[in-house]
């Protein structure tokens, strides 16, 4: 996230990092990167050591599912998938700790700082990585279920039926969503029908967002970061975001995805984003840079040509 989170006690966060991971850490510097979680660089004597993440619990994860995703990533890394950049296990024996201790709203995790990392110069590196990931022996991980709730259209109608006046961008977001409501409802009907055809026996290990924004080049190789989204799911969960691809990509990946599954996850992404952004912008907000990004994200999803 771009905004420094005022609800995160950075003194408590530093104490948690020192207690659970590295007692030599003496400073945290907020990093305005990514979207959806909060990040800090942890340093000791001026040298960067760790990338600290604080995840908000409640919408995509509860404490148990987040821990399952991270601990599953650690297990997969230990089993040979060393291209996963995974959290460091805390002294508690878990990958996450609550902030503050005993709470259920925020979870802290720590990964090694990649000081030499850069983004790939060209897309496509994920093909071979996903072939290995999807072919891996499954470990305990969260299991896919429709991200978009069955109450989605009713909830949206209820939300649109009242003013969004708890923040400066609310009414603009409500007008935008209202103008696209019928198409969103059609998308959901198609999505729900496709979701009913999914067979859990065909699930594989998936990353969730393996595109170039979650790839880093370090030590001469590409690694996948942001493993909180790991899940057992249809392989197309990872492929819809990079589709379409060329023959060379498919040759490196090793198989051809199902068009109906690609469509399912294309719709799931858009509807899930619409759900999250409308919840966000119909509630209390200040017009911060993150709020502006959320409004832009909502507009981009609603204006997609999905048929």
Regions found by a protein language model. Name each.
Residues 118-179:
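A cross-family kinase active-site recognition segment
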Residues 209, 213-215:
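Catalytic-loop signature of eukaryotic-like protein kinases
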Residues 43-145:
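ATP-binding pocket architecture of kinase catalytic cores
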Residues 2, 165-166, 275-307:
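ATP/Mg2+ or Mg2+-diphosphate-binding catalytic cores
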Residues 204-205, 216-264:
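Active-site Asp-x-Gly
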Residues 197-204:
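Protein kinase catalytic-loop region centered on the HRD/HxD motif
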Residues 23-43:
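ATP-binding glycine-rich phosphate-binding loop
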Residues 1-28:
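Juxta-kinase regulatory segment immediately upstream of eukaryotic protein kinase catalytic domains
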């Amino acid at each position: 996230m771009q905004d420094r989170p005022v609800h995160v006690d950075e003194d408590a966060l530093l104490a948690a990092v020192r207690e659970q991971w590295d007692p030599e850490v003496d400073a945290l510097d907020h990093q305005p990167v990514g979207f959806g979680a909060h990040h800090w660089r942890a340093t000791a004597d001026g040298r960067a050591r760790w990338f600290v993440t604080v995840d908000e619990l409640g919408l995509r994860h509860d404490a148990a599912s987040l821990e399952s995703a991270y601990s599953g990533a650690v297990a997969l890394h230990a089993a040979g998938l060393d291209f996963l950049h995974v959290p460091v296990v805390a002294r508690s024996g878990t990958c996450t700790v609550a902030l503050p201790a005993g709470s259920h709203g925020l979870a802290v995790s720590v990964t090694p700082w990649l000081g030499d990392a850069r983004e790939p110069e060209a897309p496509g590196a994920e093909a071979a990585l996903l072939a290995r990931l999807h072919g891996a022996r499954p470990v305990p991980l969260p299991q896919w279920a429709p991200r978009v709730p069955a109450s989605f259209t009713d909830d949206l109608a209820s939300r649109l039926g009242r003013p969004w006046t708890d923040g400066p961008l609310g009414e603009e977001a409500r007008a935008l969503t209202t103008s696209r409501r019928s198409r969103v409802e059609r998308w959901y009907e198609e999505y729900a029908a496709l979701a009913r055809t999914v067979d859990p026996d065909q699930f594989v290990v998936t990353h969730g967002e393996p595109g170039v924004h979650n790839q880093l080049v370090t030590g001469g190789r590409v690694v996948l970061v942001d493993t909180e989204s790991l899940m057992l799911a249809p392989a197309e969960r990872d492929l819809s975001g990079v589709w379409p691809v060329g023959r060379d990509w498919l040759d490196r990946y090793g198989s051809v995805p199902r068009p109906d599954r690609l469509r399912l996850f294309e719709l799931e992404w858009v509807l899930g984003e619409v759900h999250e952004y409308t919840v966000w912008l119909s509630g209390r907000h200040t017009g911060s840079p993150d709020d502006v990004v959320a409004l832009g994200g909502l507009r981009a999803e609603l204006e997609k040509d999905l048929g």
